[in-house]
Amino acid sequence: MTEGNFVDYVKIYVSSGKGGKGSTHLHREKFIEKGGPDGGDGGRGGHVYLVGNKGLWTLFHLKFARHIKAGHGGDGGSDRSTGADGEDKFIEVPLGTVVKDKETGEVLFEITEDGEKRILAKGGKGGLGNWHFRSSTNQTPRYAQPGLPGLEMDVILELKVLADVGLVGFPNAGKSTLLSVLTSAKPKIADYPFTTLKPNLGIVAYRDFQSFVIADIPGIIEGAAEGKGLGHYFLRHIERNSTLLFLVPVDTPDIKAEYDILVNELTKYNPEMLDKERLLVISKCDMLDDELKAELKAELDVSFKDIPYMLISSVAQQGLTDLKDKLWKMLNE
């Protein structure tokens, strides 16, 4: 998916370098009529690496870099000198990048740590020079190995945002507003559905200089698990969150029904979603007086016996400190 500079899915072609040829050189020196073999080995072909970079949040820099090629190994020389190794290529990617084989869809590996370096395409081995093939019956071999070819492959890079808490809700539930008041993030906010078309990340500053990361996942609609709307693109990012915050506005006609739809979509996409910690947050509660809040709590106590809930107002900034405390506790239990 792409919006502006945010890209979380790219297809690229990579090729590692081929190995250099071994040398068939025979030693030549004044007054030595028959010098033996001294051909060196070819250098290895360059590798293509993926490297994790915590400073990256998008695959945008690879959107137009469709062909990435490492260098070829140099040929072996005389005096058993080895050819130079081919130039390696390093592709920096955000943490949470999953690498898939384009043809089979097989997950090859994923990058989750800063500085983590994995070989995507290994360079071809350099060929052995004729020096290796000398023997009592063939003292001047004129054969050397060719270098092995490099590896060519089409791969898919898919970014799954890494965050501690994922904000889950229907479009226009107020997730972006909540993110903006909890963190210093500045997501696009407007009073219409699907304002957010990309995951927005923010860092919540907590007590004693501690912090955690919260992600505003684009709004989910019924049928998202079947790909309705942009469902699969959105749901992919929720897989990495350890805690899910379900945000439902207090003016929703049926809070329980809306929550059940959200849970159902997540479960259909990946049943393991049910294993995550969940917190229900009812927003826009500054619209209620104390009596209505008491009535709402009584209803929620019946409908959500096993799921913790909280009442907040992002605009009036009510209940936000308690919300931070609750999330921190859930993340560190």
UniProtKB/Swiss-Prot annotation:
InterPro entries: G_OBG, GTP-bd, GTP-bd_Obg/CgtA, GTP1-OBG_CS, GTP1_OBG_dom, GTP1_OBG_dom_sf, OBG_GTPase, P-loop_NTPase. One of its GO terms (molecular function) is GTPase activity. Belongs to the TRAFAC class OBG-HflX-like GTPase superfamily. OBG GTPase family. CDD domains: Obg. Residues 4-162 form the Obg domain. Its EC number is 3.6.5.-. Mg(2+) binds at residues 176, 196. PANTHER family: DEVELOPMENTALLY REGULATED GTP-BINDING PROTEIN-RELATED (PTHR11702), MITOCHONDRIAL RIBOSOME-ASSOCIATED GTPASE 2 (PTHR11702:SF31). It is found in: Cytoplasm. Signal peptide: none annotated. An essential GTPase which binds GTP, GDP and possibly (p)ppGpp with moderate affinity, with high nucleotide exchange rates and a fairly low GTP hydrolysis rate. Plays a role in control of the cell cycle, stress response, ribosome biogenesis and in those bacteria that undergo differentiation, in morphogenesis control. NCBIfam families: Obg_CgtA, PRK12297.1, PRK12299.1. Keywords: Cytoplasm, GTP-binding, Hydrolase, Magnesium, Metal-binding, Nucleotide-binding. Pfam families: GTP1_OBG, MMR_HSR1. Its cofactor is Mg(2+). The keyword Nucleotide-binding applies. Monomer. This is GTPase Obg. GO terms for biological process: ribosome biogenesis. One of its GO terms (cellular component) is cytoplasm. The keyword Transferase does not apply. GTP binds at residues 169-176, 194-198, 216-219, 283-286, 313-315. Residues 163-332 form the OBG-type G domain. It is an enzyme of class 3 (hydrolase).
